[in-house]
Amino acid sequence: MATKDKRLRVTELDFDNVKTNLKTFLKAQNEFKDYDFEGSGMNILLDTLAYNTHYLGFNANMLANEMFLDSASLRSSVVSHAKSLGYETTSSRAPYATINVSLSTDANTKTMSSGTAFTTNIDGTDYQFVTIADVTSSNTGVAVPFDSIKIYEGTYVTSSYTVDTSDVDQRFLLTDARADTSTLTVKVQNSSSDTTTTTYTKATDITQLTSASTVYYLQETDSGLYEVYFGDGTVSKALSDGNIVQLQYVVTNRTLANGASSFSSPSSIDGVTGITVTTVSNATGGSNPETIQSIKLNAPLDYAAQGRCVTVDDYKTYTKKLFPNTQAVSVWGGEDGSYDTSTGVSSNPEYGKVFISIKSTCWFFWYKI
C-alpha cells in the first residue's frame, strides 16, 4: 500500500510553490486529514505562512548577494567591499578653470584669499567659481598679477568639529553629498584657546607613517557622505580632546558648469577694486560620483596595481581615477610604437614610454596634461 510522503519540501522559494508544499505536507498529517485546505480560514493561514517563508528566503538570498563585490547591488555594500581592497571611491568632481587675474594697485604685495568667488553664466543660470588656497603675489610695476589661478565651481564650505574622545560615535563628515573631495583641506586647531593650527595631508602609503605623522584618511559612508578619520597614535597621530577639526571643501553642481569660458570678478580682492580677469582654459572636469558599476570594475584592478603603474590595466585604472570624466581610455606601450595622428598609423617603437588615448565626457585639451 502506498504511503504519502510526510516530509516538507524546502527547495522552492517561490510563493505558489511554498504554499503548495505546505498544503501537501499538512494533508499528509493524520491530524489534518479531514480539513478543507481551500476554506477561507485555512487558506489565509497558508498564505501567511507562505508569504513569511518567501520573504525570509528572499532576504537570505539578498543577504548572500551583498556579501560579495560581484553580486552586491546596494551602493553601501559595494563601497564596503571596495574599502577592504584599499580602494577609495571617487566623489563628485567640480568643474575647474584656469584664469589670470590682475589687480591695478601700487601696493607691493596682495593676497587672494581662499574662497574668493568669480561668477559665470551658462544658459541664463549663474554659477560661482572659487579659489581653494591663499595666493600672494608681488607688484610688477603697475599691477599685481596672479597667473594660472585654478578656480572650482561651487560653494566653499567649512565644517568644524570639536573632538570628544569619550564619544565613540563621533564622526567628521563632509556634510553634503555633492562635496568634491579633491578640494578638501583638513586642519586641526589645538583648542578653542590655542589657535595654533596644523594642516593634515591625506595618507597614501601607511608604510611611510610614524606615530607622529599628521595625516588623515577618507572613506565614503553608508549614507553617501564622505568621512574624514585619523590615526590611533600608532599608525599616524591621534586627535586629543578639545582639538578642533576644520574641513574646507567645495560643494559643486557637478557637470552643469562644464564649458564655462567667461568669468566676472568679485567687487574687490584684498581691498582692490580694479580687477582684470582673463580666461586661460575653459571649465572642465565636472562629473558625478563614481557609479556602482565603475567601483566593481576598478576596485579589483586598483588592488592588483598595488599603487604602481606597470601593466596596461594599471594605467587604465589610474587614468580613470585621476580623471573621473574619462569616458574611454586606450593604453599601449612604446614598444608598440607611437601613434601618428597625421598618418593614422603607428611609427617606430619608442622604448621607455607609455601612450594614453582618452575620450572625455566633456571639453578638455588633454595635450595640456
Feature locations, PLM:
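Signature of Asx- and small-polar-rich beta-strand/turn repeats characteristic
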Residues: 1-369
